[in-house]
């Protein structure tokens, strides 16, 4: 240790030195008193007065007094913290806005009136400007200024300025890097210019920076009445900044505002409250314009109020307003209505192409990529449209200012493919059943919030429009349109709710009727929005009401039914009820997901189940044999979920062990095994543990036990546990008397699959350390639903289908199927009404099919069912009778027969489309084959 040479400092001298350096501050009242020994010397006093700009009165008052008042301390602190450069930049008069005494005095005069004062000069909202080429030069200039100022402050030993300049220097460096990358720099984020502390050099640098900033945006002519402030002028802030040019519009406005504030103060001293209020309002109205000038916007100075001494007694004109012509010019114009779908697609693609180019020019790469993806979608849609394929315009984004394209997708003739024929048949089948003649349907108008678009007529002939469509009906009928599916779903749900309200009223359930009626009324805003082409959130639609009596055979069977028939009715009812419940569950799940297509699909299946149940009820009430029923293979896309579990439950199933290892000296038949598990959640110390019961005397025990574990789906620890740890299992041999349990092996179940699946079912290998033992352990884990996404899976079900109408005699539900003109002498005595006409080709097909079925039964030496024999007889009799009638009826009956064939063609077309949509591929193929038979017969008849 080296000894310090020289005299030792007196005790306490270090603390004094620390206080002088500002390291120790004494906030006690004694420490705030000015001591008289050496501190108030004339030299120090003169130096202090020179620093603060000469305030001798305040100091003389403080001499010899006690603790200083807080106002004086704060004022001295402000004076000490100010820079000399700031004193040179501004004057006392320019700080009128910060004069708290003046503002307090004016507020005291005006009272509550100032709260209602609104700016007289409305300013347009600023628009973000693109990247300015002068910003980078400005940042470089400011960077040089801050580096010079930092060096001057370091030489002067001013630590406060050094820290402030260092922060500004780092900010400028970051902004400069961002500007070089092409990003947009907010001018308000640029630190203000500072004086470098080098006299003329600072002034020269400031002048050069100001000229550089002024050259960023070209000034407008003085005669036009519009001036532009420098683009880098920042809003008023507490940081030191350069004063505006005396000839600039900003300085002109600030001077005028200052004059009005002084005039308001003078009027207040003269007790002229009205004039003071008026002048203060005018002064306040300058604030928005000053902000607009600070942001670099164009401002109209032609309507500035005159100086206060020239102000007329009338109310002043509104002050200058920022020009909004630029924003008006850049607003996208509404395009001309397209003539067809191709033109509409090209218009919208061009709009997004322009938007992508603008985003690239502004440096917004994210928005540019988004617009380019939309352009790619439109290009694919245009190629598909030119190739003759259908385009789902509801899936394409619509740019702002463009009306939706609903109604244009079918405005051009396309190839008559099978899909097009089916869709046309669907529209024709939806005609009004009360009209006998084939009237032409007039086009209906679709109301949209932006513009109204036209829609294709349902009839191929062109008829003049008779008027707008009623508000209650939807105009477009495009079956591929998501909006139409949405509208059909909402109308069907409203009808179900109204029917439920009526049933509740009939049962004297007033509260239930009111509830269903309120729910139906609540769907009207959604219906109106859907009719206007707007999307709605179907997840907010109330669920379909369920009537338990729909699937109950309430009538007693007639005397003609046997016990076997009653049992058969009960089985069919149970199957239909299960199918209906499954359809409602899947429909609710897809409704919450917003999948309108799958929701409508299961809604239709549920309606089919109800119609089948109605057929059963009618046959049961009449004591008829059970209707013809069959099972079909239906394939569905369903959401796999375990509704009996809550979100905080996880079920662990330990099913069985397979060839578990046995200890040395024991045979497999002597193994007494059980399994214990360890799930480290919520943490390792509080892990959830349990074990199975002991299964004795086998090496392949079947445990079949389940354990409910508690989880928190959103907890971070749970995600970490399933991703990295899982569940650990130990296969243990139960020890006997004075023998401990022996661990035979371990197994680990990974739970990462639960992210996308709600069930994990695996057969794990039992290991002894890392060595396989040859044993297996079957386990399974279930949660309510996957952690991150819904699990969609395809399932095939045996679907019960009850024939509402025999396949050999399809009743045509068309517009008023008239009875054929049959002479009275040709009618059978027992036939009180004329039989409907059917296609002879279809009857021949049904007869041939029934003959093959009967022949197969006889070859198998099985009895022919009575209903099959009855169907065969009906087909043969109908075919013979209809051929005779067509030969005797003449031209009138042939025309009627042709009309019936057209109706049957439409019926089979719609049936094939509906069955194909529901997933019944075999039934759809049969309906399509019948349709082709009818079409061929109709062509032969017309020739």
UniProtKB/Swiss-Prot annotation:
Highly expressed in brain, expression is enriched in the gray matter and strongest in the olfactory bulb. The modification Phosphothreonine is found at residue 91. PROSITE patterns: C2 (PS50004). GO terms for molecular function: DNA-binding transcription repressor activity, RNA polymerase II-specific; RNA polymerase II cis-regulatory region sequence-specific DNA binding. Residues 445-456 have a biased composition (Polar residues). Gene3D superfamilies: C2 domain. Residues 339-385, 477-510 form a coiled coil. InterPro entries: C2_dom, C2_domain_sf, C2_Freud, CC2D1A/B, CC2D1A/B_DM14. Residues 630-764 form the C2 domain. The C2 domain is required for the repression. This is Coiled-coil and C2 domain-containing protein 1A. The gene is Cc2d1a.
